[in-house]
Structures are given as C-alpha cells and as structure tokens.
Amino acid sequence: MCLMCGDATLDHAFALAERPGHRLTGRFWSGTFEQAAAGALHPLIEEMKLLSASSSDLWKSPIVGLTWNDRPDGFRYFLGIETEDEAAGFERLDVPAMQCAGLWHGAGAGTVVESYGRLMRGLREAGIARDQSFCGQREEYPPDIDLTAPLALRLLLPVRGSNRGTQS
C-alpha cells in the first residue's frame, strides 16, 4: 500500500495515515446535505479535474475535499488540488499536517454516509478520538475520477495526535 493510503491490515476496517501540510488551489462551496447527495458538487469536481489536467506538475494531486459542518442545515466544503501553478480565479487554502483514519469507499460499499458510519464506529471501538480543530472530514478523489461510474474515493477523518494549523 502506498504512503498516501496508510497501513491497512485485514483485521481493521480503517488505516491511519499522515497527511503533510500543504496548500490547495480550489473553490469553496456551501449547501445542504441533500444538495450534495443530489450531485451539486459534481460540477466543482469536474472543474478540479480540468485544473489538474492543465497543471504542469509531474505528480497529479488527488482532488481533496475538506468539510466544515458549521451549521445545522448544511456544511461548507473546499475542493482543490495541490499544485505549484498559479490559477487565476481560484482560492488558496493552507492545510496543516494531520493524522487521519481512513478507508476506501467504492462500488458495493453502500452510501458514503454508511461508509463514514463504519469508519466512526471503528474509531470508537479502537478508542481513537477525532480532531475537528481544522476540518471535520477529508475526502480524496482520483484526479481522473469518472463521475458516471460508481463513486470511488478515500474517506478520512482527522484524529488526535498531530499538529494543527488554522484556516487562512
């Protein structure tokens, strides 16, 4: 398994993985859970795919989504990529280093909400505390994700035990 995925074993439903601090280029979105479930984020994901494809970087960053559950009727979401290229019209977000518990969500895994539920249950059973001081969730999509196929992405929850920064 690669450094980005962490060390998963057959007796665990999730793996712990380190994410270094980095700067993302992308866009903020705000909306309801219902809007997101109905595909409201798809145009933003497609926009990030185009940004990634136009990047001169040798390594293609995953498309990273960060969630802030900051109101009862919905949430804020930042979707972006790590790139050295300047991108006019996009926002930059400095993301601190973090340790995350994560799992892959793919075809046959149920809904994303069900997968997050499995991940949260696994953390509780393992006695691992979440750290929502920067963001609530982190999602990583392949840079060439096909949104017409069953959704495949890495779901990550920041956990205690690493340094945190602040949103800028």
Where are these regions (language model features)?
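A solvent-exposed interaction/effector surface
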Residues: 1-168
